[in-house]
């Protein structure tokens, strides 16, 4: 968030911004704008956000930027297991076959309050802030980040069919990814 009078960055914490925009500034939303933090899904959204932050977002940053090969490898493995978990949960919620469910434990997944709300998207049938948080990291992973994982190349998201379907559905939504972002990513 940038102060337009000074040009200074006021906040760069997307979680705080999303919370503020969805609560305190709700009256300023354009008509038809999605509710990214719906009241009836806040427990689920909060649980997903906590898990995505620690398991996926931080792990991806460490996997792609750590100078310590052991830390990078452990973080990359955590992200890939996280993708297994999300793929399995999305597959089960949308009646797809879960591809790697057999190797997962209850310790691998998010809190139960996150899992009970899952539908086509992480917290039901409409995208929420949790989908945004995961989407940005999956997007970074798919369009270049995976090439920086230990070993030189991690699998494309097509390796996780339900995750790939979720990603492509969001990527194709009107207004979700702008033309400038598409150009920068080479899509």
Regions found by a protein language model. Name each.
Residues 2-187:
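C-terminal alpha-helical interaction module
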């Amino acid at each position: 968030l940038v102060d337009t009078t000074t040009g200074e960055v006021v906040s760069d914490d997307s979680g705080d911004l999303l919370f503020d925009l969805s609560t305190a500034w709700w009256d300023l939303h354009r008509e038809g704008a999605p509710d990214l933090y719906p009241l009836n899904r806040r427990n689920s959204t909060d649980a997903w956000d906590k898990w995505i932050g620690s398991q996926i977002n931080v792990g991806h940053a460490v996997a792609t930027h750590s100078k310590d090969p052991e830390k990078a490898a452990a973080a990359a493995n955590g992200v890939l297991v996280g993708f297994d978990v999300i793929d399995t949960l999305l597959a089960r919620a949308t009646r797809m076959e879960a591809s790697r469910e057999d190797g997962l434990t209850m310790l691998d997944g998010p809190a139960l309050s996150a899992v009970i709300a899952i539908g086509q998207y992480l917290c039901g049938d409409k995208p929420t802030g949790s989908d945004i948080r995961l989407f940005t990291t999956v997007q970074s992973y798919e369009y270049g980040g995976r090439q920086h994982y230990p070993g030189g190349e991690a699998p494309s998201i097509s390796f996780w069919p339900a995750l790939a379907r979720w990603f492509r559905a969001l990527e194709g939504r009107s207004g979700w990814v702008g033309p400038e972002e598409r150009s920068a990513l080479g899509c």
